[in-house]
């Protein structure tokens, strides 16, 4: 039997450690935005929506992203705390699926991240009524210009409607592309005691 064909590419290990290893490889391999991830949310009635966002922090306590709390996603997150994330790194032929629940980051965390952003990005976020109807693009640009005039030093304060969420994972699934679609999948489930159970899945 071909040992290379039967060897498992996804280790029996702490899934957060595997994520850290794969994410490091993605940062070295992906040409654009290796921290881009699909975020799936749903209404209280279960109507789903999905969009790309950027991972801005991760560790033992979860995965962090930031957004406008008054956007469509913000409304859905307020109504339904269950979410799913998906990373797809085409250059590595890998993907990671994460399921879990969200909680807001602390105001201090949100302030620190907002202050770290480029001044133009801060202006754009402060001026945007995200997901609401916009009569024309010039209206948005005029709002950005007005804020730029109000804060010529670029120190735009974080709007109250802009913050971040931390996803606490309950399930993490790793997928590795293999030849002839004989892919490899391993799913980890949180055991409720700080550990994980691991299962190899049919592709």
Curated annotation (Swiss-Prot):
- Name it: Pyridoxine/pyridoxamine 5'-phosphate oxidase
Under the subunit heading, UniProt states:
Homodimer.
Q: What Enzyme Commission number(s) does the record list for this chain?
A: 1.4.3.5
Traced from the root, the source organism's taxonomic lineage reads: Bacteria, Pseudomonadati, Pseudomonadota, Alphaproteobacteria, Sphingomonadales
Tell me yes or no: is Oxidoreductase among this UniProt entry's keywords. Answer: yes
Q: How is the cofactor bound?
A: Binds 1 FMN per subunit.
What InterPro entries does the record tag this protein with?
Pyridox_Oxase, Pyridox_Oxase_CS, Pyridox_Oxase_N, Pyridoxamine_oxidase_dimer_C, Split_barrel_FMN-bd
Entry function: Catalyzes the oxidation of either pyridoxine 5'-phosphate (PNP) or pyridoxamine 5'-phosphate (PMP) into pyridoxal 5'-phosphate (PLP).
Residues annotated as transmembrane: none
* Pfam hit, one: PNP_phzG_C
- Cofactor(s) this protein requires: FMN
